[in-house]
Amino acid sequence: PPHNLTEVVDGIIAVIDDPMITTEELMTHIQGPDFPTGGVIMGKSGIRNAYTTGRGKIILRAKAEIEEHNDRNRIVVTEIPYQVNKAKLEKHINELVRDGKIDGISSTRDESTEHIRLVIELKRDANPNVVLNNLFKYTQMQDTFGIILLALVDKQPKILTLREMIDYYIAHQEDVISRRTQFELDK
């Protein structure tokens, strides 16, 4: 999964400075995946499993707020889980309302410009927390994202821990610098 480059570089520097650093200590530098569409990662156990075993799964939720507008509540979604298509999400919500699987929604509209803004207008008598929980349950506003830290090691695919990935990266960089230096000396 994508990560914040600054956090990854900080983690690499931490491993170089302290070769005995544990995964828990490394997680203070590399806190978890950083998805471009945002979303909220629910819990740390999935990240911890992925970083310690090379496999894990995380639950991503859309970032949504309940607002009051003209004596009615509405749910405003400002971030969606990674790889979720906003237009398909809106269409799916409308289908669920039409089929009667989710009650309390009067309309949806996409007010996005530069940033995501999906507005879900609620009926007057609707409980916004119940509607929001149903949206998480029945739509991709809550999604599971599997993590496999897979890389080629000696031309063979191998599942690595976070620490092993960083160690292989550092070894690769040392090899590149050694070869470049030897090439320059041989000129």
What spans do the regions from the language model cover?
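C-terminal interaction appendages of subunits in large macromolecular complexes
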Residues: 2-187
